[in-house]
Design a protein with these regions (language model features):
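Short, solvent-exposed alpha-helical "recognition" segments
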Residues: 295-313
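Short alpha-helical "recognition helix" segments of helix-turn-helix
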Residues: 286-287
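Helix-turn-helix DNA-binding elements, focusing on the entry/boundary residues of the two helices
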Residues: 283
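Class I S-adenosyl-L-methionine
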Residues: 1-104, 210, 250-260, 267-272, ...
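Class I SAM-dependent methyltransferase SAM-binding "motif I" and its flanking Rossmann-like core
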Residues: 65-156
Length: 328
């Protein structure tokens, strides 16, 4: 609807082509891959002329899309939202600020990680993150630190912009960083052009990931230590097997309680931490065991232990005479 209502449509050449059937009678402004700021400037210029402008992205505009660059350009140009807002000056007095009349609406879409996950099974059922391998705007050491941290923390990871004609080594570097923390057989799914005409899906493993057919239109999903492949599906368990007998009567496992934190949750872990330390384990050894910072372990030991959870039970009212319970 937003594109159909627009007077002007601005976007990357490929994205314009994807919505060609919606563009009859509209002003179309095509820009190249590296002209994101120019697109935002053009959108502001046309909006100031009184036109409705659709600035299109693939996936979700707020995930590696045009939402961020657009707001940066608008704010640098002195734009404020059209609604009357209140701000407080240095003296504590409220000031009324009226915007310049240009309304901006971010319309959410399905990001590549959502679309790709739906095509390959359920890989994002537990904690995950996304990392772009594009170093056009981000220094490589920053990207590498994020990759290493995500790999060590056992996130399922969606890699955006994994490879291009010029950027071919980044995916290899990412693989090497992940192999420092993950099994070589960790499941990997590579989805190219999700839900488009040339859609292609390939399943592989972490040790062979860099050999796969990967390009700019690909999204790479790397599983965590519990992710598995079965019947052509990539699945990351949510963790129910930690608490429940998922193969038998679905009952709660010994030592666990339904609706309460795991025995290895925060309170249980703190109890174990204190017990291990009292038994002679050093702070450094505990930090190494849990792969957590030494100062965090020390702070956890310095803090008072939380009160243990106590199960609350209500006194059962005696059954009235003549009831089934009373006759039992």
């Amino acid at each position: 609807a937003a594109i159909q209502e627009a007077d002007t449509v601005i976007g990357y050449v490929t994205y314009i082509r994807l919505v060609a059937d919606l563009l009859d009678g509209k002003e179309i402004i095509r820009k190249s891959m590296t002209e994101e700021l120019d697109r935002a400037v053009e959108a502001l210029s046309r909006a100031r002329e009184g036109k409705k402008v659709a600035l299109i992205s693939s996936g979700d505009a707020g995930v590696y899309g045009m939402a961020g660059p657009t707001f940066e350009v608008l704010l640098q140009a002195g734009w404020t939202p059209p609604a009357i807002t209140l701000e407080t000056d240095e003296a504590g007095h409220e000031q009324r600020i009226v915007g310049d009349g240009i309304e901006v609406e971010i319309i959410p879409g399905a990001s590549a990680l959502n679309s790709c996950a739906a095509l390959v099974g359920a890989p994002l059922t537990h904690d995950f993150c996304s990392i772009s391998l594009s170093d056009l705007l981000t220094p490589w050491p920053t990207i590498a630190r994020r990759l290493d941290a995500a790999a060590q923390a056992d996130f399922v990871v969606a890699l955006y912009n994994p490879k291009s004609g010029r950027r071919t080594r980044q995916i290899v570097e990412a693989q090497q960083l992940f192999l420092r923390h993950r099994s070589p057989t960790t499941p990997v799914a590579i989805v190219k052009s999700a839900y488009r005409r040339r859609q292609h899906i390939e399943f592989t493993t972490l040790d062979r990931m860099a050999e796969a057919d990967i390009g700019m239109l690909s999204t790479v999903l790397i599983g965590n230590s519990n992710t598995f492949m079965q019947h052509g599906l990539m699945i990351t368990p949510r963790g129910y097997a930690n608490k429940y007998d998922v193969t038998g009567d679905r009952g709660v496992k010994g030592g666990e309680r339904s609706g309460r934190s795991l025995s290895s949750g925060l309170n249980g872990w703190l109890q174990s931490l204190h017990a291990d330390h009292a038994a002679g384990m050093s702070v450094a050894d505990l930090a190494a065991q849990y792969r957590l910072p030494v100062d965090y372990i020390q702070a956890s030991l310095d803090a008072p232990l939380p009160e243990p959870e106590v199960s609350k039970s209500r006194r059962k009212t005696p059954a009235a005479s003549g009831s089934p319970e009373g006759n039992a």
